[in-house]
Amino acid sequence: MPKVKRSRKPPPDGWELIEPTLDELDQKMREAETDPHEGKRKVESLWPIFRIHHQKTRYIFDLFYKRKAISRELYDYCIREGYADKNLIAKWKKQGYENLCCLRCIQTRDTNFGTNCICRVPKTKLEVGRIIECTHCGCRGCSG
């Protein structure tokens, strides 16, 4: 996979604090992409990629909105350079979507009956002892 060209502009102040974590997550992403998929179902081979993408986006979201540890300029830089998913962050800011695992789970066009994914069903409404896994990303329940 070719390296993505980043902007020529130097990153804002504070980048050196979050860069090691983002580099580590990028390395995990590369490992997940090259991981062999023998013995797994077709959909299971993408689950680690979705988890790492969620983890990287959640890291930047928490730094900016929860802990207020990075500046708006650095946050915008991370969004612009593709380190975080701005659409997923936009959903996390809405009530009821604070723990959303991925955007595919709320897209109704991907299902036969125009409904959300099984992981969006509250655990109180599911059968007791029933273990569910989302077919899109492997989530075990992100609605609460």
Curated annotation (Swiss-Prot):
GO biological process assignments: mRNA splicing, via spliceosome
Matching InterPro entries: BUD31, BUD31/G10-rel_CS
Localization annotation: Nucleus
Residue span of motif Nuclear localization signal: 2-10
Superkingdom of this protein's organism: Eukaryota
UniProt keyword list: Developmental protein, mRNA processing, mRNA splicing, Nucleus, Spliceosome
Chief localization: nucleus
PANTHER family: PROTEIN BUD31 HOMOLOG, PROTEIN BUD31-RELATED
Recorded family membership: Belongs to the BUD31 (G10) family.
The protein's assembly and partners: Identified in the spliceosome C complex.
Name the record gives this protein: Protein BUD31 homolog
Organism in which the protein naturally occurs: Xenopus laevis (African clawed frog)
